[in-house]
Regions:
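Cys-His-centered catalytic/binding microenvironment captured across papain-like cysteine peptidases
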Residues: 36-40, 49-104
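Conserved active-site-adjacent core of cysteine acyl-enzyme catalytic domains
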Residues: 1-40
Length: 104
């Protein structure tokens, strides 16, 4: 990744991921930080719970195969947050969907 991701893009990505979870199983997302690359990782989304302040995506993380993890979209900040894990200090991440089908 060689460019920053803006809040408006992350809001569109949140909507795209909600739609993806309704239409097909398990979208795969790339999580990263730029310009200081403190995380470069992918997870598989399989569920979602919405509330007024946030959207919590349930995900499979290959680094933590024993239980689901949460990827949180904070509506007010228009940003994704990945909680702390043994490989990550926790905090904001940029998110993009990496595979949507045979033509993408």
């Amino acid at each position: 990744m060689v460019f920053p991701i803006w809040p408006a893009h992350q809001e569109r990505m949140m909507r795209q991921l909600l739609q993806a979870l309704r239409q097909r199983p398990a979208p795969i997302v790339h999580l990263f930080r730029f310009p200081r690359v403190t995380i470069n990782h992918a997870i598989l989304l399989f569920g979602v719970a919405e509330s007024e302040p946030a959207i919590q995506f349930e995900a499979y993380d290959p680094n933590i195969p024993g239980h689901p993890v949460k990827l949180i979209y904070e509506r007010a900040a228009r940003a994704f947050v990945l909680p702390q894990a043994h490989y990550w200090a926790g905090g904001r991440v940029s998110v993009i969907e990496v595979y949507r089908g045979g033509l993408y």
